[in-house]
């Protein structure tokens, strides 16, 4: 892994609730970047959206952060960061990226320290921060008034994207349809999930509301938390469903 560029992957979203598909995005993206021979993924960050995002059926951020922490108990490289969810208001994605980039700079400066014996080349390379998303997010860049062009350009030019394809999406076309994405496509990495994976948080919420099993769609610890906290449940639908959902 010598001379590879270190990378931190950041995923923003509702995580309402976090699913196994969210975790797979990180694994697929890491494999793809490693296979290029140029990058070494050193960390993954999950950033649940602020409560003021106003999305329908969005449970409180402290629950979503707690569920993400439980889901990541078995991961040695992905963590949840509550900063975005703890802000006074909803934060645009580019502002979340800026925050974590500043944190990387601060962390790197502290690690290097004022050591006069170190030459610049001897210092560890500053990790690149890249936004991790599904192809559905790439498609939303074309939605009128949803993203500012200046923000899209900053994301793809300064940071970069790692986009994991999902069935029913054509990321290459989304890029070719956007002058900004086309200009900076060298900084957009398209990874393909070889396993058909159609788990969505929307489906999970619907299944929970109808008292259906979500076992194997979510980490077991998350299912237990949802049951114990009574989240996404209508009319006591967990009754008679057993402890594992």
From Swiss-Prot:
Disulfide bonds: none annotated. Pathway: Cofactor biosynthesis; NAD(+) biosynthesis; NAD(+) from nicotinamide D-ribonucleotide: step 1/1; Cofactor biosynthesis; NAD(+) biosynthesis; deamido-NAD(+) from nicotinate D-ribonucleotide: step 1/1. NAD(+) binds at residues 14-15, 90, 93, 134, 136, 146-147, 166, 197. ATP binds at residues 22, 56, 139, 202-205. Divalent metal cations. Mg(2+) confers the highest activity. It catalyses: beta-nicotinamide D-ribonucleotide + ATP + H(+) = diphosphate + NAD(+); nicotinate beta-D-ribonucleotide + ATP + H(+) = deamido-NAD(+) + diphosphate. One of its GO terms (molecular function) is ATP binding. Keywords: ATP-binding, Mitochondrion, NAD, Nucleotide-binding, Nucleotidyltransferase, Pyridine nucleotide biosynthesis, Transferase. Its EC number is 2.7.7.1, 2.7.7.18. Its main location: mitochondrion. Activity is strongly inhibited by galotannin. Inhibited by P1-(adenosine-5')-P4-(nicotinic-acid-riboside-5')-tetraphosphate (Nap4AD). CDD domains: NMNAT_Eukarya. GO terms for cellular component: axon; mitochondrial matrix; mitochondrion; neuronal cell body. It comes from the Eukaryota. SUPFAM superfamilies: Nucleotidylyl transferase. Its cofactor is Mg(2+). One of its GO terms (biological process) is chaperone-mediated protein folding. It is found in: Mitochondrion. PANTHER family: NICOTINAMIDE MONONUCLEOTIDE ADENYLYLTRANSFERASE, NICOTINAMIDE_NICOTINIC ACID MONONUCLEOTIDE ADENYLYLTRANSFERASE 3. Homotetramer. This is Nicotinamide/nicotinic acid mononucleotide adenylyltransferase 3. It comes from Mus musculus. The lineage of its organism: Eukaryota, Metazoa, Chordata, Craniata, Vertebrata.
């Amino acid at each position: 892994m010598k001379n590879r560029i270190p990378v931190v992957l950041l995923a923003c979203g509702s995580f309402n609730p976090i699913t196994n598909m969210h975790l797979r995005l990180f694994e697929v993206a890491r494999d793809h970047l490693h296979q290029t021979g140029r990058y070494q993924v050193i960390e993954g960050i999950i950033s649940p959206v602020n409560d003021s995002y106003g999305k329908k059926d969005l449970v409180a951020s402290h629950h979503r952060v707690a569920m993400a922490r439980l889901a990541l108990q078995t991961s040695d490289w992905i963590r949840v960061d509550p900063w975005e969810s703890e802000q006074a208001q909803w934060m645009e994605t580019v502002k979340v990226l800026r925050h974590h980039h500043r944190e990387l700079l601060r962390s790197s400066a502290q690690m290097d320290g004022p050591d006069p014996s170190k030459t610049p080349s001897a210092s560890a390379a500053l990790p690149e921060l890249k936004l991790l998303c599904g192809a559905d997010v790439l498609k939303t860049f074309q939605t009128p008034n949803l993203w500012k062009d200046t923000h899209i350009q900053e994301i793809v030019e300064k940071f970069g994207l790692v986009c994991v394809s999902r069935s029913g999406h054509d990321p290459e076309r989304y890029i070719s349809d956007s002058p900004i994405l086309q200009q900076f496509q060298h900084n957009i990495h398209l990874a393909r999930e070889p396993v058909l994976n159609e788990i969505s948080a929307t489906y999970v919420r619907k299944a929970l509301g109808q008292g259906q099993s979500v076992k194997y769609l979510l980490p077991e610890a998350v299912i237990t938390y949802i049951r114990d906290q009574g989240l996404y449940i209508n009319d006591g639908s967990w009754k008679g469903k057993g402890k594992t959902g």
